[in-house]
Amino acid sequence: MINVEIVRNYNKWREYKQINKSLIKKITQNILLRFDNFSKIKQFELSILLTNAAEILTLNKQFRNIEKATNVLSFPSNELNWQDLYSKLEFLDDSDYMHLGDIAFCYEVIYNESCEQHKTFENHFIHLLIHSILHLIGFDHQNDTEANIMENLEIEILSYFGIFPPY
């Protein structure tokens, strides 16, 4: 089971009713089911903040020391490593609960990017959600190898949902 908590701190998000708990659960489940190591966990939790440029700028400055609005910020609750996800070793403790982390999305930046990239707002949001969940479970793009692995997984998941890959 995946429990999703959504906080909408900006009214423009209400225009996108399709961005809801059901969509977020479906995408999260699709990602987690790809890794056997998550199979013992019975309950996952994920917190989502749908906000504006002013708040994301504050968060970005506070947590990353970058004074600029960004499209999305991911705050993992666990220190996972993507390489462990592919091993048959059980790297998780015996807990049947896992809080994956928190994700904050910025409406204005996502809207502007979707217009510039000629994508629908929803499809761009879904791509950023997939990207963020992958960060929460230990994926990163600090070097070309990691970036390629993460991008290929994003493409695979986006294709599953019928969304053309952005790369």
Swiss-Prot record:
Q: What is its main location?
A: cytoplasm
One term under GO cellular component:
cytoplasm
What are the protein's UniProt keywords? Cytoplasm, Endonuclease, Hydrolase, Metal-binding, Nuclease, Ribosome biogenesis, rRNA processing, Zinc
Quote the InterPro entries the UniProt record gives: MetalPrtase_cat_dom_sf_prd (IPR023091), YbeY (IPR002036), YbeY_CS (IPR020549)
Where does this polypeptide localize?
A: Cytoplasm
GO MF terms here are: metalloendopeptidase activity; RNA endonuclease activity; zinc ion binding
Q: Indicate the enzyme's highest-level EC class.
A: hydrolase
Q: Which domain of life is it from?
A: Bacteria
EC number(s) in its UniProt entry?
A: 3.1.-.-
Needed cofactors, names only, are: Zn(2+)
Q: How is the cofactor bound?
A: Binds 1 zinc ion.
Q: Which terms under GO biological process does the entry name? A: rRNA processing
Which residues are involved in binding Zn(2+)?
131, 135, 141
Family membership: Belongs to the endoribonuclease YbeY family.
Cite the PANTHER family for this sequence.
ENDORIBONUCLEASE YBEY, CHLOROPLASTIC
Its function, per the record, reads: Single strand-specific metallo-endoribonuclease involved in late-stage 70S ribosome quality control and in maturation of the 3' terminus of the 16S rRNA.
Q: Which HAMAP family match?
A: Endoribonucl_YbeY
Please state what the protein is called: Endoribonuclease YbeY
Gene behind this chain? ybeY
